[in-house]
């Protein structure tokens, strides 16, 4: 029998939701509540393909969930709140405590709160959503799905930093990795498209959006990933620097008189494509500017692609080869130019890709861009983290 599952992504003043019919993975409705706790909160819900928007004051997440459930009934999406069978909550950081998704109990809630020091901007906000749903829908399973969980299969040699070992033991300082739900979804989907068990494949997954991370997935398990202790590490991103020499932080502080917090803010919000180009963090703007002859915008795009290119070579070495390269997320799914730059010169690894196929895969289209004879397959897959969340609610919420 079909189940109705809510996939939830709660921010400090927002709540993103999708109602999904399982196991069909059919989207019933989706929407967004913005400006929670502020004046003129905005509630948007999709009804029969049309967006319905209302503006009203919503004081907290409990009221936001209440309004959402009322809207479901008002638009005949459900007859009764008991029609909802389970909820799945995106939680950014599960640390080492949570190697997989978990049914939420009071104890789990407490542990997520304790992990907030590892994700101070996200975990407390994710908890607001969890608490609101547990309060208003107390009789159904609620499941936490962690961005970090998929990467908990990394071996020590991949996740340890070359620091005094007691820093890891005392403070949990290590690589955690993020975007795990997306990497897991696309690796499973790539295996389906190839009609091979994921256990038999070596996959390099490139989740490239405003935030970007690359993952080495060997036999269905993450064995390395580009993000680190925080999502600041790895490749160049929209506004994040990615990897830099750590000695630059005190150097910048000395030269500019800025505090460590201010430098960290610059690395997170003023660097990456924005910092390099000086104009925008949006790849579409930079592509237009580069076409019109802006050298700095072109340079920013070149740096961005070269960092991803380098990780592909590195992860192919880590897995002693590669069978599939996956592109996903906003840029990975839509930027013909970045895919081409990233794949350039990889023929020595057995990557032969078709420029025509590359040009045709845009706006949510899924498919292969390699030539049929290419030993390494290259595939574009629109990510669907919400379906992955719903699958985990079915599994870990005991609904199968």
Swiss-Prot record:
Amino acids binding ATP: 16, 207-211, 282-284, 330-334
Residues involved in substrate binding: 90
Annotated keywords: ATP-binding, Cytoplasm, Kinase, Magnesium, Metal-binding, Nucleotide-binding, Transferase
An annotated GO cellular component: cytoplasm
Catalyses which reaction(s): acetate + ATP = acetyl phosphate + ADP
Entry annotated with the keyword Cytoplasm: yes
Required cofactor names: Mg(2+); Mn(2+)
Annotated Gene3D superfamilies: 3.30.420.40
Cofactor binding, per record: Mg(2+). Can also accept Mn(2+).
UniProt main location, coarse: cytoplasm
Pathway in which the depicted protein is active: Metabolic intermediate biosynthesis; acetyl-CoA biosynthesis; acetyl-CoA from acetate: step 1/2
Localisation: Cytoplasm
Active-site feature positions: 147
Pfam families: Acetate_kinase
Any one GO molecular function term: ATP binding
GO terms, biological process: acetate metabolic process; acetyl-CoA biosynthetic process
EC number: 2.7.2.1
Signal peptide: none
The protein's role, per its UniProt record: Catalyzes the formation of acetyl phosphate from acetate and ATP. Can also catalyze the reverse reaction.
Similarity comment: family membership: Belongs to the acetokinase family.
Subunit structure: Homodimer.
Protein name (Swiss-Prot/TrEMBL): Acetate kinase
Lineage: Bacteria, Bacillati, Bacillota, Bacilli, Bacillales
């Amino acid at each position: 029998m079909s189940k109705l599952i809510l996939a939830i992504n709660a921010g400090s003043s927002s709540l993103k939701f999708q109602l999904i019919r399982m196991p069909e993975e059919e989207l019933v409705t989706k929407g967004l509540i913005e400006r929670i706790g502020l004046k003129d909160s905005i509630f948007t819900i999709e009804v029969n393909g049309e967006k319905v928007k209302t503006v009203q004051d919503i004081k907290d997440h409990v009221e936001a969930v209440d309004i959402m459930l009322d809207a479901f009934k008002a638009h005949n999406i459900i007859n009764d709140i008991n029609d909802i069978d389970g909820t799945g909550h995106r939680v950014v950081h599960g640390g080492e405590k949570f190697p997989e998704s978990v049914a939420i109990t009071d104890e789990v809630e407490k542990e997520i709160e304790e992990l907030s020091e590892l994700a101070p901007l996200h975990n407390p906000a994710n908890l607001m959503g969890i608490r609101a749903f547990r309060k208003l829908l107390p009789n159904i399973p609620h499941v936490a799905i962690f961005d970090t969980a998929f990467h908990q299969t990394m071996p020590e040699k991949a996740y340890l930093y070359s620091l005094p070992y007691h820093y890891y033991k005392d403070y949990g300082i290590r690589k955690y990795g993020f975007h795990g739900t997306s990497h897991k979804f696309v690796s499973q989907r790539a295996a389906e498209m190839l009609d091979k068990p994921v256990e038999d494949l070596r996959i390099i997954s490139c989740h490239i959006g405003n935030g970007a991370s690359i993952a080495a997935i060997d036999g269905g398990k993450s064995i390395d990933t580009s993000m680190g202790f925080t999502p600041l590490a790895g490749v160049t991103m929209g506004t994040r620097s990615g990897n830099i020499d750590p000695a630059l932080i005190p150097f910048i502080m000395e030269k500019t008189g800025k505090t460590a917090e201010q430098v960290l803010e610059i690395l997170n919000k003023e660097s990456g494509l924005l910092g390099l180009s000086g104009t925008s963090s949006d790849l579409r703007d930079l592509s237009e500017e580069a076409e019109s002859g802006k050298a700095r915008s072109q340079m920013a795009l070149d740096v961005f692609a070269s960092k991803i290119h380098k990780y592909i070579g590195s992860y192919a070495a880590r897995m002693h080869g590669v069978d599939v390269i996956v592109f996903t997320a906003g840029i990975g799914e839509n930027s013909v130019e970045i895919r081409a730059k990233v794949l350039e010169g990889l023929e020595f690894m057995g990557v032969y890709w078709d420029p025509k196929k590359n040009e045709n895969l845009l706006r949510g289209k899924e498919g292969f861009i390699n030539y049929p004879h290419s030993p390494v397959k290259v595939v574009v897959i629109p990510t669907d983290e919400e379906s992955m969340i719903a699958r985990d609610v079915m599994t870990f919420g005991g609904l199968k």
